[in-house]
Amino acid sequence: MVDARTDELRQAHDALAELYADRLAHILDRMPIDRAVLGLFCDLVLDGGLGTAVGDIGCGPGRLAPYLAGRGLQPRGVDLSPEMIRVARRDHPGVPFDVADVRSLPFEDSSLGGVVCWYSLMYLAPSDRPRAFRELARVLRPAGYLATAFKAGDNRLRRGGRTVGVEFDIYWLSPEEMRRQATDAGFHVVYWAGRPADPDEHQPQGYLIAQRR
């Protein structure tokens, strides 16, 4: 049975699928720091001999797929929202996408060289974070890499989506919290960074790359 919080998040992102596809389609072109962190992740996976299979967890409309594929990886996206997956399949027909929850991923144990969670872990309730990080570790090969971006803040619960007509829970996460969750799940943090908010953003952004032990 899906809990009310998860159902609200799914419905909200179903409603936002086309808007996100339009707004985010080429946003990486305007985000050099995000590209740099993703590029570092790609280099670590490929240089580590971990293969090319990577998961894009909370992929939304699939905006990262062209970049990851262009760097020589083979992404597979998953998202909680069926509408996000429908749009991702339409816009990126050469990439596999599936409906799935980060707390229960459709990947075999130790099957991926890397996983990307780009602004997707911030939707998890605090009680769900340990399970999600353990699940990410489960699907990674030994020495595989996790890369995540998140809205950096004080870990307090906020309500998001109101400016676009929906509502859902969201957390602005502290770097300390993200490092702790990764470490507790069996990761070794190899990189973390942050940047100030851009003019069209309301909060700083954080980045973390961690390697499965």
Regions found by a protein language model. Name each.
Residues 1-49, 154, 196:
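Conserved class I S-adenosyl-L-methionine
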Residues 53-57, 61-104:
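Class I SAM-dependent methyltransferase SAM/SAH-binding core
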Residues 103-115:
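A short acidic, Gly/Pro-enriched loop at the edge of an enzyme's catalytic core
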Residues 130-142:
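A short glycine-rich, Lys/Arg-flanked "PGG" loop and its adjoining helix->strand segment in the class I
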Residues 143-150:
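Conserved beta-strand signature within the Rossmann-like core of class I S-adenosyl-L-methionine
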Residues 151-169:
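Short, glycine-/aromatic-enriched active-site segment of Class I SAM-dependent methyltransferases
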Residues 170-185:
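Short alpha-helix
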Residues 197-213:
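Core SAM-dependent methyltransferase catalytic element
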